[in-house]
Amino acid sequence: MSEDNGTINLEEFKNSFLKNYGGSAESVQLFSSPARINIIGEHIDYNGGKVFPAAIDRYMYFAIRKRADTKVIYNDLKFPGTFEFNINENFAYKKENDYANYLNGILSIIKKRGYKFDSGFEVLIDSTVPAGGGISSSSALECGFAYAVSELFGFGISRKDIALIGQQSEHEFMDVKCGIMDQYIIATAKKGTAELLDCEKIEHEYVPLEMGDSCFVVMNTKKKRLLSESKYNERREQCETALAQLKAAATPLPAGGKFSNTKDLPDLCSLTVEQFNAVSSILKDDVIMRRARHAVTENERVLKAVEVLQKGDLNELGKLLKEAHHSMQYDFEATGIELDTLAEAANAQEGCIGARMTGGGFGGCAIAIVKKDKADAFIENVQKIYTQKIGHDAGFFKCVPADGVSRI
């Protein structure tokens, strides 16, 4: 595996499959499924805003083949041990099944939706996606597996439904209440683009994202995100409080947005920045006001990002990333010393066009847009600063926008 481009040797991968399962190579089918980043648009999917993710060229790989019996067998080159099940069983979550739970969850939902399996199958998995790195290794696993199974058995499940099956499996099988962004971008992405995604309507538009002589660098804090769920819920409640207070005040709004009175607002992101500034004094609690201000300004940054990329202007996108980090740090207070150190160190480097934290915050990852010829020096310098300040290394890799789940 090459660290630089995140690909594997497919011939070796196929040979590993045959070593595990025997037989001949002709009926083995290969698939890939990418990781993802959210370029801009944090904590606004539940405030009526749009997100702006891209798939990246780090992949999960699947080699899969039908069997003559009803056995389902999983092997993963990154995790020891073989898991064996029967396609006709009622799959249930079991802690000891480890990563196999993600796969069984997908099979359980596919069966629930009425698809019939005429045999079992065997699968081998490999990956260049760092696990637990905040770039959706679990969604890449789920969607890639769902797509591979759908293709192998001729189910013809649409890309949108692949995403929805992944989300349904998280909700019903894994008991994780996730949004749709991760699965959706992984299932539907196109190389050289990002997606403006409306998570409420589940609709997207492709926006050109030609990197030219630049690339993304993903920077992983390697901080365990223990507090993230309770903090996430707290932030969500604060936004709901802000909306409730604005609606209760029933105040006229200046022109320019979709609504003329705060009482009619369905969500915070329906406000323009100008409208919000005109009524923000209704929010007496400074914390509540700042949480709402983040949602409104972040939504506007997403729309601006789309505008500047349609003109191919990466420099303007870089400025928006810096503003977005500042808003997450001071208005939303969802960064922490690790992410702030990475973003600050990154933005100070030569060749860095802009950097910000990405994902839910409180640990996880940051992203930077960096000139390709400066990327190695960038990584070295940021690593040095981070290690000195935080006391342990961060993880880094370079990437560019990539296709969604694919047959190889």
Predicted regions and their residues:
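C-terminal nucleotide
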Residues: 2-36, 61, 65-96, 193-252, ...
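Glycine-rich phosphate-binding loop
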Residues: 362
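Short, charge-rich binding segments
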Residues: 53-55, 63-66, 114-115
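Short Gly/aromatic-enriched secondary-structure transition segments
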Residues: 48-55, 235-236
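FabD-like malonyl-/acyl-CoA
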Residues: 139-140, 365-369
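Gly/Ser-rich oxyanion-binding loop with an adjacent helix/lid
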Residues: 1-31, 38-50, 84-89, 96-209, ...
